[in-house]
Amino acid sequence: MAATGVHTSEGRQTGRLASRAETAQRVLLLCGLMSSLLYVGTDALGAIRYPGYSYTSQAISELGAIGSPVAALLMPLFLTYDVLLIAFGVGVLRAAVDRNRALRVAGALLTAIGVIGLFWLPFFPMHARGAGTTLTDTMHIVLSAVTVLLILLAIGFGARAFGKGFRRYSIATILILVAAGALAGRDGARLAAQLPTPWLGVTERINVFGYLLWVAVLAVLLLRSRSHRADA
């Protein structure tokens, strides 16, 4: 009787620990969806609060640039986005334990993107248009290029996490990001030369929002996968 009671108590404790671990994992994965929504909302808020800002012709980075009237408002929100992305990356790493190596690599890359973001905007913001170029602008461009590369790699590795449908969607996302990124890069050179960039805001947002959508879709699929496993 006593032994049976001990085993029952241990079983309950193990069940509670497993339940807490599952809840924590779901929260981490939910951070992926929340991070994408927060970034889009922060971008929209900044564009609304920035007098004279053009959503079609100005870059997202200009919202947090040195001299931007909304930089102080947006900084905590962008940093929160990075923290959420890091949490999601950890969640992907944990979810990949019973999946495949490619998903583990994707989780590590997403975590790295979030870590870079924590240093990118606070320490290496660009200057507002017409203010000239300094070391921070150069580092901003370098970190931007590194982040884009990590994003493409994360999507490429993450494409193998689910079936053919998600793989095709991921490949299409990469193609769109490369095309939009090339156009944004061309306008970036014009921005550095103090020339007009009538479509920079559009092409850059296609690039960024395409990636954010992919992160959100991955988060939803991973959450659904866990729900189906729990119901089985």
Residue ranges, per PLM feature:
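Short, charged juxtamembrane terminal tails flanking transmembrane helices
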Residues: 2-8, 224-232
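Hydrophobic, aromatic-enriched alpha-helical segments typical of multi-pass transmembrane helices
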Residues: 17-53, 59-63, 67-225
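Short, Lys/Arg-rich, polar N-terminal cytosolic tail immediately upstream
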Residues: 1-24
